[in-house]
Amino acid sequence: MTLAEEFKSRNFSIYGQWTGVLCIFLCFALGVANIFHPTFVIAFSIVCLVSSFVIIFIEIPLLLRICPTSPKFDAFIRKFSSNYMRAAIYGVMSVVQWISIWPQATSLIVAAIFLMVAAIFYALAGFKGQQFQGSKTLGGQGVAQMII
């Protein structure tokens, strides 16, 4: 299945996964950009940076196979294999970034918006009863097994 066919499949988990990939870049860039604020925003930017690395392992399953990680971390990441669990973690990460507006309004709101959109996509996939379908481009559905 090509990338265009994946998007035409109307499976919201595919949309959520690609929104999650966009969140990786946004969280990393905005976390670095906001880490130099002299206010309490630094804590939220660090959380945003950590979120970007967690999302990398959630959305790109191939990395769990090629990166040396601990069994505890692997078990933690594997908890987010269903649409509802992914919606939950994206929702929590989004709420944390929405709270970052309290000390000072910064560009972290963009990360909050996109994390919320990813959570909505995964929640819609769960509500519609769609099975989680990983994108082949990101290492889902057999790509990891082909490398090993």
From Swiss-Prot:
It is found in: Golgi apparatus membrane. One of its GO terms (biological process) is vesicle-mediated transport. Pfam families: Cg6151-P (PF10233). The keyword Kinase does not apply. SMART domains: Cg6151-P. It is a multi-pass membrane protein. The chain crosses the membrane at residues 12-32, 40-60, 82-101, 107-127. Its main location: Golgi. Signal peptide: none annotated. Keywords: Glycoprotein, Golgi apparatus, Membrane, Transmembrane, Transmembrane helix. It comes from the Eukaryota. Glycans are attached at N11. GO terms for cellular component: Golgi membrane. InterPro entries: TVP18/Ca-channel_flower. Golgi membrane protein involved in vesicular trafficking. Belongs to the TVP18 family. This is Golgi apparatus membrane protein TVP18. It comes from Phaeosphaeria nodorum (strain SN15 / ATCC MYA-4574 / FGSC 10173) (Glume blotch fungus).
